[in-house]
């Protein structure tokens, strides 16, 4: 699958950062001629790019006519996922029939081993990490890459026998036909409305993961994840209740027994799973379905699931003080993720005191407000869109505004009782107040540690 990039013209990388830099390394190693365009004056990765090749053609700053001409005459544009396809100069290239791809497309042209792709509004990183652990437990040299952190083109250096890719909607936009060994969509809820004109556009980007797949795994409980019916494509569904229709291979949770099941077989009991919440039961079911598609034994899958304790900042246990549990779900950067955490944890605690807020990315908080009214005893809000969230909560739910994470944690703890949960699950991005969701989670943990009992 080599040699698919044209060599008589420049390939243009639009957007540097971690992904763009990985593309530059990939093209440089293959002797391809390329140029780099980034609208930022000092984009991350600029020094590394110069160290790679100090003569590389590049433009940092506002895109003007010379850069537009370059794009309109490119052999191919490799677009970083952080760059909005609605940008004027990208739209001009599309109208000029210039091929626009992403690093995932380049990776899939190159790779010769099985590739599993995982998308969804929530749970992608957790499921990707767990699926990689399952692959390793089954004896494959396995590599997790993509949106989880390691750029896929850098992952080629791992020479893995099995790749597990976390794929965002932005990455899927720039792949023509993924053709994955297994394609999985966990769930779909409103997110990134600052990057999409309509919710349906976001859903359509997610659906691209199924194009050309050999096996598809989807959430029976979420109609938006339903894949198209294609002859020869094996379908596996998962559900938090036993499906009424038995026409397809289904992996489900039996509330009566606490068992995760496949047909009439018990796979594992919920008590053997270390990660919190019903939403993580769904995630584990998805992993069993994907492992089945890869012909990985259930024994290997069970062993990996039992050992997996989750990822930082995803429903992560922090401490228990004065009988009050603290959980860090800072990675809940959208409404759907926070709703999954609240609904999934509410049955395990007397009350929930929720810390939320931040950059809402133009989300609609109406459904979030209804869930808060039903399950949250006290809502502590912070960040840019605190007011937008407060407007969607009824007057019967106590709402407190906090200016810092320390203040939010102290307010929550002072209002909490034994058996309660203080949950950081913001339903928003973090960049209005923090360096990222990791920084937000660390500040939460530090504030909890600083509490006096």
UniProtKB/Swiss-Prot annotation:
SUPFAM superfamilies: MurCD N-terminal domain, MurD-like peptide ligases, catalytic domain, MurD-like peptide ligases, peptide-binding domain. Its EC number is 6.3.2.9. The keyword Cytoplasm applies. It is found in: Cytoplasm. It is an enzyme of class 6 (ligase). Keywords: ATP-binding, Cell cycle, Cell division, Cell shape, Cell wall biogenesis/degradation, Cytoplasm, Ligase, Nucleotide-binding, Peptidoglycan synthesis. ATP binds at residues 120-126. Pathway: Cell wall biogenesis; peptidoglycan biosynthesis. It holds the Pfam family MurD-like_N. GO terms for molecular function: ATP binding; UDP-N-acetylmuramoylalanine-D-glutamate ligase activity. One of its GO terms (cellular component) is cytoplasm. It catalyses: UDP-N-acetyl-alpha-D-muramoyl-L-alanine + D-glutamate + ATP = UDP-N-acetyl-alpha-D-muramoyl-L-alanyl-D-glutamate + ADP + phosphate + H(+). Cell wall formation. Catalyzes the addition of glutamate to the nucleotide precursor UDP-N-acetylmuramoyl-L-alanine (UMA). Belongs to the MurCDEF family. This is UDP-N-acetylmuramoylalanine--D-glutamate ligase. It comes from Teredinibacter turnerae (strain ATCC 39867 / T7901). The gene is murD.
């Amino acid at each position: 699958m080599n040699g698919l990039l044209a060599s008589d013209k420049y390939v243009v990388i639009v957007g540097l950062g971690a992904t763009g830099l990985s593309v530059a390394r990939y093209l440089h190693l293959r002797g391809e001629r390329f140029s780099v365009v980034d609208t930022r004056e000092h984009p991350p990765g600029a020094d590394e790019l110069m160290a790679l090749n100090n003569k590389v053609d590049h433009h940092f700053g506002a895109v003007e006519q010379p850069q537009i001409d370059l794009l309109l005459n490119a052999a191919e544009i490799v677009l970083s996922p952080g760059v909005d396809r609605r940008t004027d100069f990208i739209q001009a290239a599309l109208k000029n029939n210039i091929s626009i791809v992403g690093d995932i497309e380049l990776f899939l042209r190159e790779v010769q081993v099985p590739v599993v792709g995982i998308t969804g509004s929530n749970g992608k990183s957790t499921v990707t990490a767990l699926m990689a652990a399952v692959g390793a437990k089954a004896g494959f040299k396995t590599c997790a890459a993509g949106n989880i952190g390691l750029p896929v083109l850098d992952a080629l250096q791992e020479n893995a026998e099995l790749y597990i890719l976390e794929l965002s909607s932005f990455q899927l936009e720039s792949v023509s036909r993924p053709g994955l060994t297994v394609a999985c969509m966990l769930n779909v809820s409103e997110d990134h409305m600052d990057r999409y004109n309509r919710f349906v556009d976001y859903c359509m980007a997610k659906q691209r993961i199924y194009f050309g797949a050999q096996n598809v795994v989807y959430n029976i409980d979420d109609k938006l994840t339903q894949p198209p019916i294609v002859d020869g494509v094996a379908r596996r569904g998962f559900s938090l209740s036993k499906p009424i229709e038995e026409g397809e291979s289904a992996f489900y949770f039996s509330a009566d027994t606490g068992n995760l099941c496949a047909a009439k077989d018990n796979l594992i009991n919920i008590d053997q799973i270390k990660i919190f919440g019903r939403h993580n039961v769904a995630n584990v079911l998805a992993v069993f379905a994907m492992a089945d598609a890869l012909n990985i034994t259930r024994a290997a899958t069970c062993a990996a699931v039992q050992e997996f304790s989750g990822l930082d900042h995803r429903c992560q246990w922090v401490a228990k003080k004065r009988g009050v549990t603290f959980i860090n779900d800072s990675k809940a950067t959208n409404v759907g993720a926070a709703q999954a955490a609240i609904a999934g944890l509410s049955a395990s605690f007397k009350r929930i005191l929720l810390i939320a807020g931040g950059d809402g990315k133009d989300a609609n908080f109406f459904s979030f407000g209804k869930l808060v009214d039903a399950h949250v005893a006290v809502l502590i809000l912070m960040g840019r869109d605190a007011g937008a969230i407060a407007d969607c909560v009824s007057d019967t739910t106590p709402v407190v505004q906090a200016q810092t994470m320390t203040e939010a944690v102290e307010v929550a703890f002072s209002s909490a009782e034994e058996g309660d949960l203080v949950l950081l699950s913001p339903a928003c991005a973090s960049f209005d107040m923090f360096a990222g969701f990791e920084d937000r989670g660390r500040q939460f943990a530090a504030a909890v540690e600083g509490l006096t009992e």
